[in-house]
Amino acid sequence: MHPTHIKVLTPNSKDLDILCVALSIVKTLDQINDFKILVKQALNQGFDINMKDGDHCTLLYYSCTLKLYEIAQFLLENGADPNIRNTVYDQITPLSVVRTQPKTEQSIYLTKLLLQDSLLKLCQNNDFKIIDNSITVKDIEEFIDWRMSISSKNNEFISYHLKELHNLQNHLVRNTKFSNSEIIQKLDSILITAEDYNKSFEQLPEQLIDKTEAIEPELTGKVAEVISETA
């Protein structure tokens, strides 16, 4: 459902209502900056950036749906959780939303950020070192570094780590100690098969891959340039 039609059912409903409506009309760089100020003000007053509306969607989910990638990065930097699903309709995460959108320099970069943040939160919230015969925090950190690269030369390495994450998930499911663990749900929300990963980028032009590979982890300004050129 579009942000302007949300049904707010939460303690900070007024703030969420205002922010969702403001987000739905953002088009220019000035409006992006104004929205960031609104979010900062709300956060200073105790607003929960991961709050869901009546349709169980977060601000991060809506910003990805509306292709407002700079705002999505801003929300991630301020604590937005990319692992939260839209639990009423399609049951997907912000990452799933961006994956289905046309491959552009900005959308690919945001995909990288969402993947990185998802896996980092997984590392921070859980000590994988206690799990025998599985991956360690070091493995995941290494995986994140390589996952940020989309060039074909790294596909074999990335595929290996995707399989490792699936092995971890299977291990947790079989182990009664972790059978009801939230870790399993989080893994399920971010995992794709190695085959699906490779398919995601096999049709990309080499020029776009080269440009995206060169982008440093800082989106601010990139989307602004595109907006100013098309406004």
Curated annotation (Swiss-Prot):
ANK repeat copies, ranges: 55-87
InterPro entries referenced in this protein's UniProt entry, alphabetically: Ankyrin_rpt, Ankyrin_rpt-contain_sf
PROSITE patterns membership: ANK_REP_REGION, ANK_REPEAT
Keyword match Chloroplast: no
Alphabetical keyword list: ANK repeat
Name of the featured protein: Putative ankyrin repeat protein RBE_0555
Originating species: Rickettsia bellii (strain RML369-C)
